[in-house]
């Protein structure tokens, strides 16, 4: 019975793996390369703590504390592209409830998740365009537009309490994302007075109609030695706020090597997206990151993506900027085109004023 339940619940990732492994073997004349070459880990991985920031110093502190907190976030955004937040206002009980609802959602049969139109048909798994194991993500997710969560046409099936929990989580993580983004913007421009309302003009065009909440599950993987949970990438947004469980598996590129992020209970992870790097004239870094597969246990996470409308001009914190003007829609279209034609995302180098990317 347990084996049948696993087959019914999980997407056919093993089938994708075997097909890609066979394709790779055929290309290499019947000899598969070592697993570490497939994953591209580049040797031993250090486990590190991300810079830790107490957000309450920004939201409730005096002028000196607000300035120090914003400065700490700006340094982390410049040096790491990632940091963690404590005292962020997203309650432990709410996130535990979100994990319970998330687990119930992902325990549904694969056919139900894929075909029934749950959560506005936002279900996805693996990578349908993968042509090698380097492009395969051992994961499934619901990538839900915020506006859809409260929509009458968004089907939650029998998960009657999921809508309310997702709405609460989205609202709480939205407050965090906008507070952090405004403070980071103020550090570069000197505008505003600190806190969530410091720079209402930034990020331009970002509101509940343009942002996304993503529910992720990384199933235990029997091929964890040579499979990614999520392939290396940067985020095509302004800023991402992540709530992860204690399983671990998030890795980021630091000083030209992969670093494993040590999970911290009750902390949120923040990372800079491509659009913020462009807006900041490369002061803040959108850093490549990945999730490694786990052979023994599932991993769950919830991510909030702060995105503008497709017609929003990304802009700059000040001239001269190394990037030409572009909209979010133009950026997404180019990313999708590159992935389709080359198998990988090129991203910001396409938008340098004097780009050499062909």
UniProtKB/Swiss-Prot annotation:
All residue ranges annotated as the Fe2OG dioxygenase domain in the record: 207-308
GO biological process, one term: gibberellic acid homeostasis
EC numbers, comma separated: 1.14.11.13
InterPro entries: DIOX_N (IPR026992), IPNS-like_FE2OG_OXY (IPR044861), IPNS-like_sf (IPR027443), Iron_ascorbate_oxido_reductase (IPR050231), Oxoglu/Fe-dep_dioxygenase_dom (IPR005123)
Subcellular location: Cytoplasm; Nucleus
UniProt keyword annotations, A-Z: Cytoplasm, Dioxygenase, Iron, Metal-binding, Nucleus, Oxidoreductase
Misc. remarks from the entry: Plants overexpressing GA2OX6 exhibit extremely dwarf phenotype and are unable to achieve phase transition from vegetative to reproductive growth. This phenotype can be rescued by application of exogenous gibberellin (GA3).
Family the entry assigns: Belongs to the iron/ascorbate-dependent oxidoreductase family. GA2OX subfamily.
Stated name of the protein: Gibberellin 2-beta-dioxygenase 6
